[in-house]
Amino acid sequence: MSVVLTLSRAILLEEKFSECYQKMSEIVFDKYVSDQLKTLSQEEVSHVNLLKAGINFAKHEPNLFEDIHISTIEIDRGIKLLIGLKESLENKDIDIIQAIHKIYDLEIIFEEVHLNKIAEFEEPSMKQLFEALSKGDRSHRERLETLVDKLP
C-alpha cells in the first residue's frame, strides 16, 4: 500500500486507541487512573496529528516514497482488536484490569511495528515520525504498568 494510504490507516488505528483510553477513563472508579487514561487518550490524538503531518509531507514529496509500499495487515488487525475492546468495555464484558492488559499488549505490538517502520524509511523526517510514535507507545506501556499497580 502507498505511504499515504498506510499513514491514513495508522491514523484510524491511533484514533481507536484514543477512543479505548477515553472509554476506559469513563468506567474506572479511581480518579487518578481515570485522569491518566484521559491523558493517554489525548496523547493518541497527538499521534494522529504526527501522522497527519507525515501524510502532508508524503504528499508534497511523493518522489521520495514512490518505491515504498507498506503492508497494513498489522494495522488493520490492531484496528479490529481495538474496536472489539471498546465494544467489550461498552457491553461490560471485561473489567478495567482486563482492558488495561489488552491495550498494554497492543501498545507492545505497535511499539515494535513503529520500530520496524523506521528501517523502511531513508528519509529523516519519516524516521523521526516513527521514532516519536515508538517512544510514545513505550511511554504508554510504562504508564499502564503503573496503573495496574494502582488498581485493586
Per-segment meaning from a language model:
Residues 1-152:
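Non-heme di-metal
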